């Protein structure tokens, strides 16, 4: 039976039991000793694909470890699961949907049926619509109510309608097209809208309202605020269609808002929000970098799709990263994973990967609704390069928790300043090296003696300078961030998340946990404004409601 119909108990598989035994045998394993004993370790545990280079040699693994992890992937039926996803089977079982964000990056001429209908012509029709709209705006042909060209585009959306597009448009800022600035409005906090709108002119601003339902609270409230602002700045209802377009599956609601039907770009149920930057949700990306570069982004993701489907698991970048995550999460008690980009333009990749990973694999039941028997998705956290070294890297080096890390770094900078990039690259490599090597008590004492400290002071200070080392990390290197390489990088992490969900037997494509807070939020709001007088379900929430109301009564 398909993995999404009858999920396995992964802990009962022979490969899982073999990994448990192997973990016991690895208790004394030292990465430093492994490198000293094997001059080819780097070559054995590194690979190139799709413009990316992955060094995973600084991990708590041997060739046997990799073989056993690959056996696990085989025993859970990963190859069949990959085929199921790419062919459009209903792998999102709880919502009864296929999962086909990969269709959005397939080339013209490909065929893919959903419910007996080839969806590829519609996919490329929308891509052509994006191309046409972007061309009109970049050429100054799309005019605002005062007949001036559009200079600013504001994407109103939250979650997947914001995090992915923001990541890509900022990561590819060196490819930005002149004449149009792109902005993002996500939070319902009025301060965000205030700060953004203060620097805009309504007559030259275009808003993109991105919401599948056209009913997402934060997005709809911000869209209404933008509409009120537009009217207050001199715009009219009659000309509103020049300043608002939508990406939504709810055409009726978008039209009722004042958006013309021809300016509503569709969304499909088979594309989840956190996987949607490749769709019309990526319209602000195309506006920022141009459609030629947007298509390069899609092409890069497609090359990773091909690699994922065809490469043997022991040479498959997403599969290897996923297996390493399972290895640490389920056999080494790691609860989190750090994403550490050493590139200013990639500073938002951690936020996107937080949603991608934690919303996908933050699950506690199998596809059939029975409880899992393993830990599942980790906490994803981190931040940009050298800044983190002066903040939280201390915990990575000397804390009590094992926290695997991904270092991401380009070889070439877009903006070389003196020898800054050489230092940036050196810092990235030295951090992964320090995590692995650590510092022994003997090394700490020798270091202090060399500084002239007496033995009593050395005895006191040396324990504080000991760094355990033997802490794992991956290093992902790109020659330089480009649309194609970025597409491959993001797609790689998408597939990594999917592989882990297959191993754990969970559904990576629903997010029911998000809904409860939304439902409760409505009644909390009603109590805040006084339209609902009965007490909240618990004393804490009611107490906080009373505090708010007390302050607002003056």
UniProtKB/Swiss-Prot annotation:
Where does it live in the cell? Cytoplasm
UniProt GO cellular component terms: cytosol
Q: Which GO terms describe its biological process?
A: gluconeogenesis; glucose 6-phosphate metabolic process; glycolytic process
The enzyme's E.C. designation: 5.3.1.9
Source lineage: Bacteria, Pseudomonadati, Pseudomonadota, Gammaproteobacteria, Pseudomonadales
Q: What is this protein called?
A: Glucose-6-phosphate isomerase 1
Q: Which GO terms describe its molecular function?
A: carbohydrate derivative binding; glucose-6-phosphate isomerase activity; monosaccharide binding
Q: Which family does it belong to?
A: Belongs to the GPI family.
What does this chain do?
Catalyzes the reversible isomerization of glucose-6-phosphate to fructose-6-phosphate.
Give the intrachain disulfide bonds: none
Q: Which PANTHER family match?
A: GLUCOSE-6-PHOSPHATE ISOMERASE (PTHR11469:SF1)
Which reaction(s) does its UniProt entry say it catalyses? Answer: alpha-D-glucose 6-phosphate = beta-D-fructose 6-phosphate
Q: Which UniProt keywords apply?
A: Cytoplasm, Gluconeogenesis, Glycolysis, Isomerase
To which species is this protein native? Answer: Pseudomonas putida (strain ATCC 47054 / DSM 6125 / CFBP 8728 / NCIMB 11950 / KT2440)
Pathway linked to the protein: Carbohydrate biosynthesis; gluconeogenesis; Carbohydrate degradation; glycolysis; D-glyceraldehyde 3-phosphate and glycerone phosphate from D-glucose: step 2/4
What is the main EC category here? isomerase
A Pfam family? PGI
Active site per UniProt:
359, 390, 518
């Amino acid at each position: 039976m398909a993995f999404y119909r009858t999920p396995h108990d992964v802990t009962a598989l022979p490969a899982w039991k073999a990994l448990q035994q192997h973990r016991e045998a690895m208790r004394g394993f030292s990465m430093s000793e492994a490198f000293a004993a094997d001059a080819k370790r780097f070559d054995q545990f590194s690979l190139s694909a799709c413009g990316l280079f992955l060094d995973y040699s600084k991990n708590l693994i041997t060739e046997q470890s990799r073989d056993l992890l690959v056996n696990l992937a085989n025993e859970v039926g990963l190859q069949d699961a990959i085929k199921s996803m790419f062919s459009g089977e209903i792998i999102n079982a709880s919502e009864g949907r296929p999962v086909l964000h990969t269709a959005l990056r397939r080339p013209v001429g490909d065929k893919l049926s959903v419910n007996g209908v080839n969806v590829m012509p519609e996919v490329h029709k929308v891509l052509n619509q994006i191309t046409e709209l972007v061309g009109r705006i970049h050429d100054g042909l799309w005019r605002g109510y005062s007949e001036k060209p559009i200079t600013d585009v504001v994407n109103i959306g939250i979650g997947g309608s914001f995090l992915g597009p923001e990541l890509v448009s900022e990561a590819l800022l060196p490819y930005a097209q002149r004449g149009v600035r792109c902005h993002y409005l996500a939070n319902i906090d009025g301060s965000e809208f205030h700060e953004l709108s203060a620097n805009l002119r309504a007559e030259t601003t275009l808003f993109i309202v991105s919401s599948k339902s056209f009913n997402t609270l934060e997005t709809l409230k911000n869209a209404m605020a933008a509409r009120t602002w537009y009217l207050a700045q001199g715009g009219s209802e009659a000309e509103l269609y020049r300043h608002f377009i939508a990406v939504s599956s709810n055409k009726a609601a978008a039209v009722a808002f004042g958006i013309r039907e021809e300016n509503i770009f569709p969304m499909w149920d088979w594309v989840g929000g956190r996987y949607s930057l490749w769709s019309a949700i990526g319209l602000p990306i195309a506006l920022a970098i141009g459609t030629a570069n947007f298509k390069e982004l899609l092409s890069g993701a497609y090359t990773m799709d091909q690699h994922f489907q065809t490469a043997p698991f022991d040479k498959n970048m997403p599969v290897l990263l996923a297996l390493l995550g399972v290895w640490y999460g389920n056999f080494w008690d790691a609860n989190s994973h750090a994403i550490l980009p050493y590139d200013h333009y990639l500073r938002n990749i951690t936020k996107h990967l937080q949603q991608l990973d934690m919303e996908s694999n933050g699950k506690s039941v199998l596809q059939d609704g029975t409880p899992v028997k393993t830990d599942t998705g980790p906490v994803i956290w981190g931040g940009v390069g050298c800044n983190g070294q002066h903040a939280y890297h201390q915990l990575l080096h000397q804390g009590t928790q094992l926290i695997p890390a991904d270092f991401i770094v380009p070889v070439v900078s877009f903006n070389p300043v003196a020898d800054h990039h050489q230092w940036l690259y050196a810092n990235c490599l030295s951090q992964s090296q320090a995590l692995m090597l650590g510092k022994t008590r003997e090394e700490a004492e020798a270091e202090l003696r060399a500084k002239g400290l007496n033995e009593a002071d050395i005895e006191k200070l040396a324990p504080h300078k000991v760094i355990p080392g033997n802490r794992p990390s991956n290093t992902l290197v790109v020659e330089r961030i480009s649309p194609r390489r970025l597409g491959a990088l993001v797609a790689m992490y998408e597939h990594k998340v999917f592989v882990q969900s297959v191993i754990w037997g969970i559904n990576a494509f629903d997010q029911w946990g998000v809904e409860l807070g939304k439902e409760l939020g409505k009644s909390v709001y009603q109590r805040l404004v006084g339209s609902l007088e009965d007490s909240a379900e618990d004393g804490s929430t009611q107490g906080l409601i009373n505090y708010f109301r007390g302050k607002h009564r003056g």
